[in-house]
Every structure is written in C-alpha cells, then in structure tokens.
Amino acid sequence: MKLAQLKKSSKLNNVCYDIRGPVLAHAKKMEEEGHRIIKLNIGNPAAFGFEAPEEIVQDVIRNMSKASGYTDSKGLFEPRKSIMHYTQEKNIPNVDVDDVIIGNGVSELIVMSMQALLDNDDEVLIPMPDYPLWTAAVTLAGGRPRHYLCDEVSNWYPDLKDIESKITEQNKSDCCKLIQINPTRCF
C-alpha cells in the first residue's frame, strides 16, 4: 500500500519565523565570513547572565523526585507562587497563584494564548519591530497581524497615529487585541 504524500497546511502560507529562518541563515553566512555574531535568537538567557531566582532553583531541586510524571496543567505550584510574589513586588494588582500558568517556554505560551483568544479573521495590532513569533502565532490561530510602528528616533515608543490608523471593525472591540510586547522594553 502506497502512503499518500503529506503536504503542509495552507495555514503556513503566510508564516515566516525569521529567528530560525532567513535571518539565521544570513547570520551564519556572516559568521563564516569572519564576522562576530552575538546569538540572541534562540532564547538562552543563562548564556547572557540572566539566572533563575534562587527560590525557583531550590524548588526544582526539591521536586526533582516528582518529575517523572505530569504536573498540574498550570505548572508546578512553587514557581507559580514565586511569579505571583514577583508581581506583588512590582505592584501589579490582583494576581493570584491560580492566575499564573507556566509552560515550556515563551513559544508554547504565545501560541497557546493566541489560539485561546483569537477567532478567525480577528486582527491583532503588533509592534514593529516585533518578536516574529507573535506574527506567526496570530496567523496560525486564524488571526490577521497588523503592525504598528515603534520608531527608534522616538526612543522606540509606539506611534499613536499609526496605531489609530490601523484600528478597523475587525480589531475594534470592547477589548482591542493589542500586543504590547516590545523587545526595546520602552513600556
């Protein structure tokens, strides 16, 4: 019996993930030419001095013997509690430990949240420059990304007129879907 050839979903037609695609290929070429490349594309924060809080490290050690099975679907309680405490230190109101969900990295959580929040043809306003996974996740969830400008000359703050020009009936709602994650951390 001959197996049917698998073909990729049309959902991938407009998905480009530059972190592992053309930008990475160009960076490798530059590296081969002798350029020094700092690799920030895969998300290994430890390589750049960002370490897990000691409370989380100790909780992982303490729970290692329980790690052979599934955890609570929201993640281990202790790290969720630590995250809740962090939000309290930052004066972020009304965050309870049950509001915190931990995943296997930001990629999983971005895709999961877009699938949970978007209906087909919902438009999502995304800052430009952006973390490419936002655009890919919106597209895979059936939404349509609309990029608004964050200009270096303006200290990377969003261009409010550009945002206003991008508001349409597809993204105008009681809760406008606006992604404010910005690699420049100006927010």
Residue ranges and their predicted role:
Residues 2-3, 13-105, 112:
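N-terminal small-domain helix-loop-helix segment of the aminotransferase-like
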Residues 146, 151-187:
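Active-site phosphate-binding strand-loop segment of PLP-dependent enzymes
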Residues 94-100, 120-123, 170:
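Short acidic capping loops at alpha-helix termini that bridge into adjacent secondary structure
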Residues 43-45, 107, 131, 178-181:
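Short glycine-rich anion-binding loops that position phosphate/pyrophosphate groups of nucleotides
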Residues 116-138:
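Conserved PLP-anchoring active-site segment centered on the Schiff-base-forming lysine
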Residues 140-146:
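A short helix-loop-beta submotif of the ANL/AMP-binding
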Residues 26, 113, 162-166:
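CheY-like receiver
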